[in-house]
């Protein structure tokens, strides 16, 4: 029986797919996925719960706190859904949660995963504007605009999730007996490919380009001013962009390939076996980015001396960036005054 119990838009129910006689044993990719899910759940739930607590109750009501609060909420909800993924894989992709849950729960997982990606791109764009257009930021950058940007990111994530909600169904198998949850596009291959292309462009290529462009220009500006040529800035830039690319690339590439393959082809079946592992890989990115900012933004001895909540408050407050923006604004105004 084919493994259609995963939780992404790549799942396709096709009665003509050959029977997989090894479905009664967990494959190596599934075992690796279970290990990754367990680690991400334990680390991600605790870390994101702490970030939510700090940003909501302890940190100053800064714009950075708004960004990271939304990002942590998305990551936290994604991590809470991991026991569902874990249970289904352990049961050889059997779906015991019913038809309504088949539509809602996997769609919520996708919603939160895409929201995390788009919020990360929004944070990067905000930092870009803060450095390159500080006067505009002083005049217009506020909490209200930040919440609007977050709402747009959540709304776009919702649009990316709609195909999963509309076309997800359950189907009963008999050899061996199990219930499968997957996306059924029927015989309309063009619709399936359109969904895959939209997911690739809006959920991967555009956020990746945003991250790369913003951090590249920020790095060039930092070097041109000779402000901080330490490896700290470079580590943050490389780590954020590289982690995004590494963890999401397998999920997106396999999804695109499967949308153009026949379900009965050997390549499709091979990619299906790797599906759980690709999803678990993408999940790692949902809990790693704030860790990158904390670890790369503090020296090792400083991290030892400070408590984790204190480190988070340090990262989430904007005092250093605000001082830099104000300093740059004053120098710009003074230069303009001298010219006039």
Swiss-Prot record:
Membrane topology category: Multi-pass membrane protein
UniProt xrefs under Pfam families: 7tm_1
Cytoplasmic side: 58-62, 126-146, 220-235, 297-340
Region (Involved in C5a binding): 14-23
CDD domains: 7tmA_C5aR
Modified residues (Sulfotyrosine): 4, 7
Subcellular location: Cell membrane; Cytoplasmic vesicle
The protein, known as: C5a anaphylatoxin chemotactic receptor 1
């Amino acid at each position: 029986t084919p493994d259609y119990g995963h939780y992404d838009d790549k799942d396709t129910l096709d009665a003509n797919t050959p029977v997989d006689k090894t479905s009664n044993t967990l494959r190596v990719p599934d075992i690796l996925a279970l290990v990754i899910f367990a680690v991400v759940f334990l680390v991600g739930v605790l870390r994101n719960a702490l970030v939510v607590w700090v940003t909501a109750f302890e940190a100053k009501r800064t714009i950075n706190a708004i960004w990271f609060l939304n990002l942590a909420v998305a990551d936290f909800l994604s991590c809470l859904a991991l026991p569902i993924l874990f249970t289904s894989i352990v049961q050889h992709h059997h779906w015991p949660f019913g038809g309504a849950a088949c539509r809602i729960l996997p769609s919520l997982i996708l919603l939160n995963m895409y929201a995390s990606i788009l919020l990360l791109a929004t944070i990067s764009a905000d930092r870009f504007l803060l450095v390159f257009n500080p006067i505009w930021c002083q005049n217009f950058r506020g909490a209200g605009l930040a919440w609007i940007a977050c709402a747009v990111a959540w709304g776009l994530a919702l649009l990316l999730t709609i195909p999963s909600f509309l076309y997800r169904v359950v189907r009963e198998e008999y050899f061996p007996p199990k219930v499968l949850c997957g996306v059924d596009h029927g015989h309309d291959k063009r619709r399936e490919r359109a969904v895959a292309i939209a997911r690739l462009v809006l959920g991967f290529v555009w956020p990746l380009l945003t991250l790369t462009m913003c951090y590249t220009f920020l790095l060039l500006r930092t070097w041109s001013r000779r402000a901080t040529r330490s490896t700290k800035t470079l580590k943050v830039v490389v780590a954020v962009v590289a982690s995004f690319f590494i963890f999401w690339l397998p999920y997106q590439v396999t999804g695109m390939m499967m949308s153009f393959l026949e379900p009965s082809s050997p390549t499709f079946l091979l990619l299906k076996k790797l599906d759980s592992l690709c999803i678990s890989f993408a999940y790692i990115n949902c809990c790693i980015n704030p860790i990158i900012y904390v670890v790369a933004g503090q020296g090792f001895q400083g991290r030892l001396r400070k408590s984790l909540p204190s480190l988070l408050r340090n990262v989430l407050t904007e005092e250093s960036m605000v001082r830099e923006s104000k300093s740059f604004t004053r120098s710009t105004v003074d230069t303009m005054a001298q010219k006039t």
